[in-house]
Amino acid sequence: MARACSLGLLLLLLLLLRTVVTVSLPVIVVRLNKAALDYVSDIGKAPLQRALQVTISDFMDPSGEVLQSTRVQILDAHVPFFYLKFIAGFGVHLSAAANFTIKVFSVPEPMELVLPVDLLADVHVARDSIGTLVLSVPACSSIFSPAGMLDGSISTSQELLDRVQEHIKADLNNKLCLHVYGLVQDLNVHLGTLIGLSPVGPESQIRYSITSMPTITSNYISLDIGAILSLLGKPILLPMHGAHPFVLPWPLGDAGAMATVGLSQHLFDCALLMLQKAGSLNLEITGQLNSKNNPLNTSVLGQLIPEVAHLFPEPTPLVLKVQLGATPVVTLHTSNSTLQLQPLVEVFAAPSNLALQFLFSLDVMVNLDLQLSVSKAKLRGSTSLLGGFQLSVATSNVGSVDMDQVLTLISTVFQKPLLDHLNALLGMGVVLPRVHNLHYVHSEVLVREGYVVVSSGLAYQH
């Protein structure tokens, strides 16, 4: 599998994507550009060299009175040149130059020679029935150049050298391409990791799959990728807004980036719906009587609401239960993304050794600035407050509530816990489409009208 690692990025090429929308699936558009192929070419030399360490059959030397079996061994396979390019509508063309250092254990003395070989292969990229990518090699050839003798082997006759070369070429001609086929099959296994489940939270997962045949041009390869978000094994389904598929313009983002990933509004909507249904956005804030920084107690609240002071003459902690009954709304505008929450905040008194006593509840609206970033293979978020809280009384067991006075108290005790909770949750991130051990690096996130674009480099880590 080690030899599959680097060329596994070649798959990623396959794994990135323009998406044709299906009704219940969020869509992501990813493109791998020429820079990604250059990276694969660079890190792919080592695994290709290992794959070319093949065994050569013994050479039967007819020069004597009796045929002699002479061992032939590849000492080293060096790949100084490895190049990949896109073939529009097909896949990727591979060309590589390899220099084989070969030792022939002939009598009376062994000889060492260097045999240059050019490898050419066309790799076809397709989608299989389970929604992952599959590679095949319909065309492969080996082109041999004349071998050169290393110093110390100059006494070998030209006739013997010619016979040895013919034997080596005949033996390697099919073996080299067979090992290229094997390398590609290893990559297919690696590509299968694209469709595995990735956790989003303790009870939620995301699963990616390729939804259509890849689109390949001379500049990039793109795939249509669908995402299924699930909670407790059940998919989160949200109707698509409009019938038009998500299309990522070309060109877009950093022209020198290896990968360009487009994330649709629908993906964000489904992710937030899942978090809301899971209860992950809910929180509880408890006051501490001995804390100077937490005025969440009946003594402070009683100064604003007389009935609270009447019911609780002794200082009693307060508890805020925050529940999001409505799905959060993310809005994506050029260079700006916001998150709107509309939680219900229930205020309870928490007398010692007694059940919580409901006081009143508030409908809250809060607008947050949403900052997005990519770390390794995850899209992460952080929030900050935009303006203030908008509060209104939903129900009350303590009579009239003067919101002008309560607003300052609730905002003070509510803001930091809310932001801390959201930032911890969004900071966990959602895994972007990738194969195992492949990470996005040096990523730049741009917000456009109705979608997000990630321009990124790629790094394969063992």
UniProtKB/Swiss-Prot annotation:
InterPro entries linked: Bactericidal_perm-incr_a/b_dom, BPI_fold-BPI/LBP, Lipid-bd_serum_glycop_C, Lipid-bd_serum_glycop_N
Cystine pairings recorded for this chain: 140-177
Keywords: Disulfide bond, Glycoprotein, Phosphoprotein, Secreted, Signal
Gene Ontology, cellular component aspect: extracellular region
Signal peptide: 1-22
Modified sites of kind Phosphoserine: 63
Source organism superkingdom: Eukaryota
Subcellular location: Secreted
Residue positions, PTM Phosphothreonine: 55
Glycosylation site list: 99, 297, 336
Single GO MF annotation: lipid binding
Family from the record: Belongs to the BPI/LBP/Plunc superfamily. BPI/LBP family.
Identification of the protein by name: BPI fold-containing family B member 2
Taxonomy of the source species: Eukaryota, Metazoa, Chordata, Craniata, Vertebrata
